[in-house]
Amino acid sequence: MTNYNFSAGPGVLPTPVLTKIKNEFIKNEFTHMSIIEISHRSTQFEEIINSAEERLRDLMNISDDYGVAFIQGGGSTQFEMLPLNFANNKNRIAVLDSGNFASKAAQAAVTIGKQATILDSSKVDHYHHLPMLSTDFNADEYDYLHLTTNNTIEGATYHQSILPKTVGRLTADMSSNILAEPYDVNDFDAIFAGAQKNLGPAGVTVAIVKKDWLKEQNIENVGSMLRYQNYLDKHSMYNTPPVFSIYALNLVLEWVQEQGGVDSMYAQNIEKSSKLYDYLDNSTFYHALVDESARSLTNVVFTTADLERDQAIAKDATKEGLFNLSGHRSVGGFRASLYNAQPIEAVDALITFLKKAENNYK
C-alpha cells in the first residue's frame, strides 16, 4: 500500500528530493560532511544559497528591481515585519480579509501600533468567497494593501486573473500556492512565503521586496533582525541562516525546474484539483465549500455536513494510507492539500476511498 500525505503544512515533498537528502545527509560529496554541519560562511553553502536565489528568480521571473531574502521566523514573523518596514508613512494598511491568515496579518499590524482597515471580509459565509476592492477604494489613504493569495485553511484563492487592481502598493502572503500557479511578480511590491507548504521543509521563509520602495522607508526604530535591508545587504546571512532548510529549498526549486517550471506545475495542479472537484461536485454526499471561481488548486476543502461522520471518515482514511485529511479545527470537514509534489495517483487513491466511504456511511 502506498501512503499519501495530504497535510497542509509541513506538506508533501518530491520523492527525488527526499532521496537526495537521505543520500547526502551524512556526507555530501562536495562538503565531505553532513549538510547540517557545514559553515554558513563556507564556499559550499555560498553556492547553495546563490543557486536557490537564482532558481527562484528564474522560476518566478523576478527582476533586479526586487531583492530576495531567506529569513527565519515563518509567515507569522512576516505579519509584523511587513508593516514595520513598509507602514511608516501613513501608519495604516488595508487588508482584504479572506481567511484566518489575512485576519492574523491585520491583527499583527495593530499589535505593533499600526492601523489596519478591513476593506472587505468574507467571514460572514465562513470565507467561502473572496472579498474584493470596492470602486471607491483610495490607495492614497494607506501605505499598502495586503492579501493572502491562497487561503490554506478555507481553500479560496486569488488567482492572477482575479487579483484586485490597485494603483497603490500591493503585498501578498503566498505561503501555500507559491510556484503552484503563475503570478506576475511585477504586480506586487512585496511577497513572502513560508517554505513548509510548497517550497520545502519548515525553517525558512522567502521574502521578495521591491528595492526602491524599501529605500523610501524610515526604519531607524525597527529592530535590526526585522529589517529587510539587513538581509539583502548581507545576502540573507545577517545572522546564521537555516542552512538545511535553504539546502532543501534549493533541491525543491531544482526539481520544479526539471518538471518544466511553474507553467508545468500549474497544468498538473489544474488536472489534480479538477479531478477531485469534479468528483465532489457530482456527489450528493460530499460538498466542496468554496465558490467555483475562487477554488484553490492546492487546498481542496469539503465536507459531508456531519461533523462526527467527517471525523470517522478521516480516521478510516489513515487505514487506507491517506494521511492528514482532516480539515482545520476552525472549519472541520476535510482538506486535501495537493501541492506541487503531490502525484495524480494520490488524487485517484483519495477518490477511490471517498467512494468507498460514501457507500459505508450514506
From Swiss-Prot:
Single Gene Ontology MF annotation: O-phospho-L-serine:2-oxoglutarate aminotransferase activity
InterPro entries xref list: Aminotrans_V_dom, Aminotrans_V_PyrdxlP_BS, Pser_aminoTfrase, PyrdxlP-dep_Trfase, PyrdxlP-dep_Trfase_major, PyrdxlP-dep_Trfase_small
Gene3D superfamilies, alphabetized: Aspartate Aminotransferase, domain 1, Type I PLP-dependent aspartate aminotransferase-like (Major domain)
Modified sites of kind N6-(pyridoxal phosphate)lysine: 197
One Pfam family of this chain: Aminotran_5
BP terms from Gene Ontology: L-serine biosynthetic process
Root EC class: transferase
Binding site for pyridoxal 5'-phosphate: 75-76, 101, 152, 173, 196, 239-240
Cofactor names: pyridoxal 5'-phosphate
Annotated positions binding L-glutamate: 41
Recorded metabolic or biological pathway in which this protein acts: Amino-acid biosynthesis; L-serine biosynthesis; L-serine from 3-phospho-D-glycerate: step 2/3
Keywords: Amino-acid biosynthesis, Aminotransferase, Cytoplasm, Pyridoxal phosphate, Serine biosynthesis, Transferase
Catalytic activity: O-phospho-L-serine + 2-oxoglutarate = 3-phosphooxypyruvate + L-glutamate; 4-(phosphooxy)-L-threonine + 2-oxoglutarate = (R)-3-hydroxy-2-oxo-4-phosphooxybutanoate + L-glutamate
Subcellular location per the Swiss-Prot or TrEMBL entry: Cytoplasm
Quaternary structure annotation from Swiss-Prot or TrEMBL: Homodimer.
Function per UniProt: Catalyzes the reversible conversion of 3-phosphohydroxypyruvate to phosphoserine and of 3-hydroxy-2-oxo-4-phosphonooxybutanoate to phosphohydroxythreonine.
NCBIfam families, per the entry: PRK05355.1 (NF003764)
Similarity remark: Belongs to the class-V pyridoxal-phosphate-dependent aminotransferase family. SerC subfamily.
Identification of the protein by name: Phosphoserine aminotransferase
Organism: Leuconostoc mesenteroides subsp. mesenteroides (strain ATCC 8293 / DSM 20343 / BCRC 11652 / CCM 1803 / JCM 6124 / NCDO 523 / NBRC 100496 / NCIMB 8023 / NCTC 12954 / NRRL B-1118 / 37Y)
Name of the gene encoding the protein in the UniProt record: serC
